[in-house]
Amino acid sequence: EENEGGIAHLRQGRRDDGVLTLGEAMAQLDASAGNTLTPPDSEYNEQLEKLRAVLRSYKEHNEDVYGYISIPAVGLEYVVVQGEDNDYYLNHNYKKESLVIGSIFVDYRCDDSIAKNFNTVLYGHNIETNGGAMFNRVTDFLKKDVFDNALICIYTMDGVYIYQAFSVYSTRPDSGY
């Protein structure tokens, strides 16, 4: 049942969508490749290639996979998708399965390359369960210490984009922003 497959597991304080965090997936790649020493100057390129391998595996399940978002300071890590509209992923996971909590997704009007966008807009439900889930954790940016220190990392096939918040605004869904 949809509700039991989504919200019930979130209430138990764990993700049950079968998605490894990016760190877990990269650790699996490390383990399967064995421990090999690489020169320090190649470390960035090696990590980027591991990242791309993980993203390719997500894209094998769904061509709509855009990337991955990580905000370590608030414990947010999710696959990011981009659909043909801004409605589909409101209630579907990255595997295109029906899920009441939906996915974090990029506005359909954005380019598939962050570098080509003037603004890249991400959406996700503000669902609060057992300490927060989905984009509810972004509300922690209202706390000064989080706002001042948290980095927002978005990983795509193009590369790694690291942001620091410069403004936080709380609004209601019907505010007409």
Regions found by a protein language model. Name each.
Residues E1-Y177:
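Solvent-exposed, non-transmembrane regions of membrane-associated and secreted proteins
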